[in-house]
Amino acid sequence: MLWAAALYAGPLDDTLATGRKALSNDGVATAWRLAQQALTDAPESAAAHEFAGEVRFRRGEFAEADAEFKAAVEWNPRFAPAWWGLGRVAECASMNKTAVEDFRRAYQLNPNDPRILAAWISRLRGPERAEALDRYAHASGDPKVLQELRQRAELARALNGREAMALVSPYKAAEVPLRPFVSGATRMRTFGLEVVVNGKPARLVLDTGAAGIVLTHPAAERVGLARVTDATVRGIGDNAKPTGGYRAIAGRLQIGDVEYRDAVISVADRSLVGIEDGLIGSNVLGEFLITLDFAGGKMRLDPLPDYRPGEEFADRTVSPQMESATRVFRFGHLLLVPARVGNARNRLLVLDTGAASTLISTELAAAVGKVNRDDKTALRGMNGKVGDVYQTGNLVLEFAGFEQKNLGMTAFDTWQLSHRLGTEISGFLGLPVLDLFTLTIDYRDGLVKFERRR
C-alpha cells in the first residue's frame, strides 16, 4: 500500500511542480488545466486543492479559491500554504482579523516559507521584524519583495517608535473642498485637494488608484522634505526600470480641518506630467468613511462606526448607511470592483479617479470582440508611456447595477500589475464614468456606494 501511495504521489508532484512554474510565469491557462488534472488524479490531496485555490485566486475567483483552501485544510489541517491562501482571501475581502489569524497559523506551521514569511513580516515590529527579514533573505525570497520590506524597516527605524500618519485632530466629521484641476500640459481633467505640508500649501490630485502621497521633486523641496529611505514609485508604463525616488516624513499634514503627524510621503525622481504638485491616494484617509461628491465639489469625511483611530481593523461589518453599497476587494491601496464587459465572465476593475478614461486589459478585449491597434491614443502612467495600445468595438460595461454602452474602449496589457498583485486585473474604472456618481468609500469594510446623480 505504501508502494502504491508513492506511485500516486510521484505524478501528482510532477503535475503540481509544472503547474506552479506555469503560474509563476503568468501561464494562468496552463496552470488552470494542470490544477484540474491534479484534482482529478488526487481528489483527496491537500496539495492539489491548495494549488487549485492559488490558480482560482490568480483568476480573481475568490469564493472558489476560498473553497479550495478550506478543502485543503480539511484533508490536512497542518498544511501551511492552505492557511496562507485562506489569509489572502480573508485579507482582500476585508475580513481583517480573520486574515491575521490565518497568516499566524501558516507562520506557526512553516515559518521559513518565503511567501508565508513575507505576509507575516509586515505584521511584526522591532527586533522580531529585523530577524524575520534576515530569514527571508536566506530563504531565497523575491528580491523585489525583500527590497520593499527593507525599505519599510528603514522607515520604521526613522520613526523610532512613533506611529506614522497619526491623527492629531479630533476624530469627527469634516468637509474638504474637492477642486477641479485641469493640467496645462495634457489638458486632462482631474479633481484634487489643497493641502498643507509642513506649513506650506500643495495641490494634490485625489487618486483612488494611488498609494499614499507622492510629491514631485520641486514640491518636496518647497515643503522641506528630506530623504529617509529609498522608494520605488510604481504605476502603469513600459519603462523597464520602475520610477525611483525616496520616502520622507512630514512633521505635519493638514487636509482641511483634519491633521496628521509624521506623514509618510514618497518623492518621485522622474518628472511627473499633469499631476499638479503630486498625488494623494484616498487610502490616506482610510480611517474615515469617505464621500466624494464631484458635482458638489466637496469631500466628506465621517467617523467609521465602532472604530477609534489607531485600532486594528476587525472583520468586515456593514453599517445601515452602507447596506446598498457594492462589495469590493482590497489589495493594499487598490479597490477592485466586480464588473462585466460584453459577454465575458465577471472581472475585476480598479477604482481609479486618476485615470482619464476607462481602460480594459488586452486579454479581456480579445475575449469580447475584435481588437485593433491604436497608435493615436497615448497612455502614460507613473512608469512612463505605454507602448502598445489597442481599441475595441462597441461594448457594454456593467458594474454596481449600472450599465453603460461604449463606442469602443481603450485596452493595454495589464499583466505587470496582475503579476505584482497576484490576481487578475482586467482594467480601470476611470474618472469619466466615476464622475457620474457620488462615491462613498469604506476601506475598512471593503465597500463602495455608487449613487447616480439625477
Which residue ranges define each predicted feature?
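Boundary at the C-terminal end of the N-terminal hydrophobic targeting segment
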Residues: 4-9
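Acidic/polar, glycine-enriched structural segments that form the non-catalytic walls/loops
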Residues: 43
